[in-house]
């Protein structure tokens, strides 16, 4: 059973970090480079619910795996640190997906209206910056977890 848990842990880590990197550095920039801002925003908005659900699932698996490895494994200090990082990444992702993204989505229809007040653009920009920062925190946590996981692998 321990091999299955390790496999699920590694799969969740790979899928989650891969999706963050792909979306942040490939998909979103390509959409905004090739489509109008309105269409790119609509496309990204359509991706976000699945993006966050997948991240929540992967991070939950990581967190459960980390706790299991702390309790049953060696390298407890590494796994405790990994648990803290996974919890931080999950908190950042939950906040981005449950609080920030819905607020930004609610503002999107007003952004491109001719009579859109300036405070709408300012609030959307603030939410976007916050979402990018939270995503960055999650990515740094994921890269650190990847490095710690690699350090604990047995040849």
Where are these regions (language model features)?
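Polytopic transmembrane helical bundles with strong interfacial aromatic enrichment
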Residues: 1-155
